[in-house]
Amino acid sequence: MPNLLLELRSEEIPARMQRKAAGDLKKLVTDALVEAGLSYEGAREYWTPRRLALDIHGLTARSADVREERKGPRTDANEKAIEGFLRGAGLSSVSEAQVVSDPKKGDFYVAVISKPGRATEEIVAEVMPGIIRDFPWPKSMRWGKASSKSGALRWVRPLQSIVCTFGPEHEETTVIPFEIDGITASNITYGHRFHAPEAITVRRFDDYAASLEKAKVILDAERRKDIILHDARDIAFANGLELVEDEGLLEEVSGLVEWPQVLMGSFEEDYLSIPSEIIRLTIKTNQKCFVTRKQGEDTLSNRFILVSNIQAHDGGKEIVHGNGKVVRARLSDALHFWKRDQGNLPDLETLAASAAKFGLDLQKPLDQRMAKLDALDVTFHAKLGTQGARVARIRALAKELAAITGADPALTDRAAVLAKADLRTEAVGEFPELQGLMGRKYAVLQGENASVAAAVEDHYKPQGPSDRVPEDKVAITLALADKLDTLTGFWAIDEKPTGSKDPFALRRAALGVVRILLERRVRLPLLATTRDGDLLSFFHDRLKVYLRDQGARYDLIDAVLTPDADDLLMVARRVEALTAFITSEDGKNLLAGTKRATQLLAAEEKKGTVIADGVSPALLKLDAEKELFAAISSASKDAADAVAGEDFRSAMEALSKLRGPVDRFFEEVLVNDEDAAIRANRLALLRLIREATGTVADFSKISG
């Protein structure tokens, strides 16, 4: 079957946009072809810095013929109805329509509309200009003389050429010649900008990809990534080092080169006195280079790895030299602000009031930065006040939480007042992603307690489902205070997540609270802390997501989660115990009996059947109902005692003793006895089953 090759070649596409753009191209083109009546066996997208390409194989040569019967009005309908039918069906007179008789509805017109299939070339030429013109780039531009005209083509960077060929796998292909803003599709492309700028004639994908590789363009982005990664590992190993791998940087760099050449540069060892995180970010952010470390060690080396798009005649010496100069200049700047952050601020006399407010020591650099943060009234959020006010709230909340977590109150207070201090450091000003981490380093340098220093960094954690959870009690306390302050604040001003929008990462903050409470076994009454039922419901949603990711069943979570359940650790423990119980043989059988009891009881309640207020032992006539009543009385007490002692497994074990009596009751006892008093008493007995199991879970919500 025929194949379609499409290439859109332009000036350099930003690396961050390439993968999505190629995926968008594939979806837009294949959707349009399928909508036009074509089918295909497979499609794959490709991208380089200067091109998006699409290979569609097994594409049908033409769309199928279509025959449609369109039912019209009765033959005796008014003239306007018939004229409307003819216009809609594309008929000039009723003589072109068929008349169909229906015994009940009479005679009516039917238009038979036949649409012959269309050649694939015609369909592609028709749909492609619209796809290109309406392409969903995040940012796009106009260029050239046509840019001043209304409706001028917009593309991420100036579009230079289009390749569009179609034909069988082993025969000559044809060019599908469509045109957009003066650019006509052809079978001509170009290779590497510097190494092979000559025109290349292509027929189909196989020779297209091979021709590009000869012209020093590796079309497959995953291959480019693989080449970069393995060459970088090899060159590092050859120098007694190992690559510090970075998947995000690898993805970006592979989108900057068409012919990757991996080289190694170096900088003076004096710069290794800068924290490794700053070195890594400086080299990554400014030069898109990888750092290395000594084999088997954590400390960085003074060698870095760069990826060039040019295979230089001198082996890359000039490229390495040029990159080295820039890296040294950037590291010199980094060393400067690293040292400045450890020094005194020039205006200490203006910070006395802020220092007094937070109990700060203006002889210490990090304390000075916190005082400066407060004195400048740096805004946290227009409706939530300044960073200083935020720190004061976190400090007060952390004091309350310390009594629950068991954290040292004095250390917790000290950590709270220093937690946001590094926001005024030059290091964090340059690299905001280092907030917390730099605060910890500066805290250590000025002699802070290890728990305080750890809390300054870790109070931001966890920042996602895979991030680690703080372990130190001071860090746990501060992390909870920070996240709870954020959540209660944004709930108070009605800035809640909506749909896919969550600009303040409130879902992440709530999940962080859930993970800390559960993974560090913290008992925290959230309603007493947040005083917001809607926010508690939000925590419940995050808890469900977390527990489901841990393998818990949704129905079991719903069975134990009540609207006012604000001790999430207890909810999780109930789910754990219920899961173990409900998967046992006793649990499965008790569930079946309990559901039968609750369903029967619910049906009678709905009908308004009289149910006794309590079970009367005198009205228990059969041994099975007497046995069940005794079992419920015993199991209910044991289960309630176990729940009171927060021993949910023992509560489940107590309830498991009901299995036999419940089974026997339904085998031997007719609930709807003719005697109304006995019936009401037996229904009351069923209610006791529901109440007994309800001490640990709502069994009616459990599937199965």
From Swiss-Prot:
EC number(s) stated in the UniProt entry for this protein: 6.1.1.14
Broad EC category: ligase
Family label: Belongs to the class-II aminoacyl-tRNA synthetase family.
Keywords: Aminoacyl-tRNA synthetase, ATP-binding, Cytoplasm, Ligase, Nucleotide-binding, Protein biosynthesis
Gene Ontology biological process: arginyl-tRNA aminoacylation; glycyl-tRNA aminoacylation
PROSITE patterns on file: AA_TRNA_LIGASE_II_GLYAB
The protein's name: Glycine--tRNA ligase beta subunit
GO molecular function terms noted in the UniProt entry: arginine-tRNA ligase activity; ATP binding; glycine-tRNA ligase activity
Catalytic activity: tRNA(Gly) + glycine + ATP = glycyl-tRNA(Gly) + AMP + diphosphate
Keyword Nucleotide-binding attached: yes
Subunit structure as annotated in this protein's UniProt entry: Tetramer of two alpha and two beta subunits.
UniProt superkingdom: Bacteria
InterPro entries: DALR_anticod-bd (IPR008909), Gly-tRNA-synth_bsu (IPR015944), Gly-tRNA-synth_heterodimer (IPR006194)
Compartmental location: Cytoplasm
Record Pfam families: DALR_1, tRNA_synt_2f
GO CC field: cytosol
